[in-house]
Swiss-Prot record:
<feature type="compositionally biased region" description="Basic residues">
    <location>
        <begin position="710"/>
        <end position="726"/>
    </location>
</feature>
<feature type="region of interest" description="Disordered">
    <location>
        <begin position="1"/>
        <end position="109"/>
    </location>
</feature>
<feature type="compositionally biased region" description="Polar residues">
    <location>
        <begin position="1"/>
        <end position="17"/>
    </location>
</feature>
<feature type="compositionally biased region" description="Low complexity">
    <location>
        <begin position="644"/>
        <end position="701"/>
    </location>
</feature>
<feature type="region of interest" description="Disordered">
    <location>
        <begin position="518"/>
        <end position="622"/>
    </location>
</feature>
<feature type="region of interest" description="Disordered">
    <location>
        <begin position="644"/>
        <end position="726"/>
    </location>
</feature>
<feature type="compositionally biased region" description="Low complexity">
    <location>
        <begin position="18"/>
        <end position="109"/>
    </location>
</feature>
<feature type="region of interest" description="Disordered">
    <location>
        <begin position="214"/>
        <end position="461"/>
    </location>
</feature>
<protein>
    <recommendedName>
        <fullName>Putative uncharacterized protein DDB_G0286901</fullName>
    </recommendedName>
</protein>
Length: 726
């Protein structure tokens, strides 16, 4: 793969606002027909993503092992068996580590089923991820320096060879030596190109996270609410892509992986093609592995930046195929492989990534994505795929970041890589939001919360707090030597600069800096893929957490049958008509077809809003919503505050109030809130159109305390006659 192809495929920061518009137009075409089948197929997609996340968690812990493995993998086809063995060992190691990391990220949370923990951590998660980004920038710079040293050594070797040849003709051995040196030089150039892309990607990610931190993780979310709601319809378009068949669901994964892993595949392909002559060059293998590890960051960035472009491709193709569905599924595979990858080999490797992930997932989930996607390629390219999976492992911190991105960005960011653990969390968050939806429906219907519900919510909150403390302890234990003060210094220090030119004694590679300035909107509207994943994960997790989530879903269904049209219309009319179509079709179809589909679509649409409103500080939301404030909006916002109780608990960066359970003068710890008597008030249902999310006024239960533009009328919606489990 040429450097130009690497640039195009590795970091394709395509215009994102255009992608959002395309997604909206696709939404209108696809929502009515495909919402019903989307959820089931999304489960398969999310299963793949979850596998990716397991591997994502590995890389941070197994960088050295991965380097060794990549060295073996670079011995090319001749060492397939060895690579398989090594990769299997690494997979075993990764699995052991994944069990630990996933237990930290997922299992502890999933056991509760409510799974608000990672969402609740909020800003600390962003800080931890920014720490990881800064560490990875240092690693990229170190690797770039190492590559530069090796290029200099190679230059010396080439000069010595030329001096030995002199004016005469080289003999066969000298010709072979020159050929090997030229191949090594090309490999080094490719590695430097990839390192530069990775450095630019990391810098872009760090800028995004820093901007989120500067905005307390809230303003970006609020600015993206409309985009995210619009994207919820486009997520159903992506769901349509997945729903077109099991194959197309793995297509979407392969699309994301195609972009995400172009650099990885480029490295592997070039090394696979060239390292036959460099089998002894462990440094190259290690550097290549480092590149691949950093390419995972490109993958994350690409998932953020390029999902819209891929989604547009998928939507355009799947809009044509939606009417034909399964007949065109294989065509989707071919089209996706051609459009998303400038290189069929990369596409094979990416599909193999999916297949490898699917194989790992098959141990847990069955699942469909192995069906028609390149089983033969999987057999041929397991080495690359294992390495790619290991490369994706770098994303422990990215998982946290994506958790934050997902939560801050309507659960959208779970970009394939992180999507993946986050998808579980999103599912769980959605389940938690199901509880919020149940509470909202109950309150909007005019029912007063009883003491048992309040105590139950407070008890749940206390349990979540205890689990959060355990999770934070585990995460702190997994960190390597960063104190909160050092972390703040890392966050405040300028980002590591990365030169626009790669120093090379033989060839100057033109590098275009792909970093773009971030806007307040559109940057995260690329998360259509993630909304799709959230739908799928809702179904998955509903299946896995049926006891908890199905109860909530039943409540949602019973309430949604009477309330969804009014609630969704009131929320979505303020955003756009596309959402009305998506929500109404999704909810109506879901109600007609059963709880699974309805909850998938309903939770996706409603929970996008709920997550934005509640994510940064969810542990107190249920108690505050039911027990203290009582002024409920459909999206679980509380009048007089931003995002529920966020304003009271989230301030500028560096304030200890970022950490949810630091006791403040006016804030009781969760174990004492249980003793507070609730302050019931009249419950109202209002549109979010006139809510000023930038206000910092204290919580108020008196509508007269609000400006006239924010006063609300009581909802005329009648209480639902259906009764759900509390």
């Amino acid at each position: 793969m040429s450097p130009q192809q690497i640039q195009t495929a590795g970091i394709n920061l395509s215009p994102q606002h255009n992608n959002t518009n395309n997604n909206n137009s696709n939404n209108n075409n696809n929502n009515n027909t495909n919402n019903n089948s989307n959820n089931t197929n999304n489960n398969n997609t999310n299963n793949n993503n979850n596998n990716n996340n397991n591997s994502n968690n590995n890389n941070i812990n197994n960088n050295n092992n991965n380097n060794n493995t990549n060295t073996n993998a670079n011995t090319n086809i001749n060492n397939n068996n060895n690579n398989n063995n090594n990769n299997n060992n690494n997979n075993n190691n990764n699995n052991n580590i994944n069990n630990n990391n996933n237990n930290i990220n997922n299992n502890n949370i999933n056991n509760n089923g409510n799974n608000v923990n990672l969402v609740n951590i909020g800003v600390p998660q962003l800080q931890q991820h920014l720490q990881g980004i800064l560490s990875k920038q240092q690693l990229v710079n170190q690797q770039n320096s190492s590559i530069q040293q090796q290029i200099q050594q190679l230059a010396n070797s080439i000069m010595i060879t030329k001096q030995q040849i002199g004016q005469g003709q080289p003999n066969a051995q000298q010709q072979q030596q020159q050929l090997q040196q030229q191949q090594q030089l090309q490999n080094f150039q490719q590695l430097q190109q990839n390192l530069h892309n990775q450095g630019a990607s990391l810098q872009s990610q760090a800028q995004q996270i820093q901007q989120m931190l500067n905005n307390n993780g809230n303003n970006l979310n609020n600015s993206n609410n409309n985009n995210n709601n619009n994207n919820s319809n486009s997520s159903s378009n992506n769901n349509n892509n997945n729903s077109s068949s099991n194959n197309s669901s793995s297509n979407n994964n392969s699309n994301n992986n195609n972009i995400n892993n172009n650099n990885n595949n480029g490295n592997n392909n070039n090394n696979m093609g060239n390292n036959n002559n460099n089998m002894g060059n462990n440094n190259m293998g290690n550097n290549n592995m480092g590149n691949n590890n950093m390419n995972n960051n490109n993958m994350n960035n690409n998932n953020i930046n390029n999902n819209n472009s891929n989604n547009n491709n998928n939507n355009n193709m799947n809009n044509n195929n939606n009417s034909n569905n399964n007949s065109n599924n294989m065509n989707n595979n071919n089209n996706n492989s051609n459009s998303n990858n400038n290189n069929n080999n990369n596409n094979n490797n990416n599909n193999n990534n999916n297949n490898m992930n699917n194989n790992n997932m098959n141990n847990n989930n069955n699942n469909n994505n192995n069906n028609m996607n390149n089983n033969n390629n999987n057999n041929n390219n397991n080495n690359n795929n294992n390495n790619n999976n290991n490369n994706m492992n770098n994303n422990n911190n990215m998982n946290m970041n994506n958790n934050m991105n997902n939560n801050n960005m309507n659960n959208n960011n779970n970009n394939n890589m992180n999507n993946n653990n986050m998808n579980n969390n999103n599912m769980n968050n959605n389940n938690m939001n199901n509880n919020n939806v149940n509470n909202n429906n109950m309150i909007n219907n005019g029912q007063q919360p009883n003491q048992q519900q309040i105590q139950t919510g407070q008890s749940t909150n206390q349990q979540l707090h205890q689990q959060l403390q355990l999770l934070q302890q585990q995460q702190r234990a997994s960190q390597q030597g960063f104190t909160p003060q050092q972390l703040q210094q890392l966050v405040n220090q300028p980002l590591t600069p990365f030169s626009n030119q790669i120093q090379n004694p033989f060839q100057q590679l033109p590098i275009q800096q792909p970093i773009q300035q971030l806007g307040n909107s559109g940057q995260f509207s690329n998360n259509n893929q993630n909304n799709m994943s959230n739908n799928g994960n809702n179904n998955n997790n509903n299946n896995s957490n049926n006891n908890i989530n199905n109860n909530n879903n039943n409540n949602n269904n019973s309430n949604n049958n009477s309330n969804n049209n009014s609630n969704n219309n009131s929320n979505n009319n303020s955003n756009n008509n596309g959402n009305n179509n998506g929500n109404n079709n999704g909810n109506n179809n879901g109600n007609n077809n059963g709880n699974g589909n309805n909850n998938g679509n309903n939770n996706n649409n409603n929970n996008n809003n709920n997550n934005n409103n509640n994510n940064n500080y969810n542990p107190l939301n249920n108690n505050n919503i039911i027990g203290q404030n009582g002024m409920i909006i459909n999206n679980s916002q509380i009048l007089g505050s931003q995002n529920g109780v966020n304003n009271n608990n989230v301030q500028q960066f560096g304030n200890p109030q970022f950490f949810p359970y630091t006791q403040q003068p006016n804030q009781l710890p969760p174990n004492q809130q249980q003793n507070q008597s609730p302050q019931p008030s009249n419950m109202v249902s209002v549109s979010t159109t006139n809510i000023n999310t930038n206000t910092s006024s204290p919580l108020s239960t008196d509508p007269s305390d609000e400006p006239s533009s924010k006063r609300v009328k009581k909802s005329s919606s009648k209480p639902s006659k259906s009764k759900g489990k509390k």
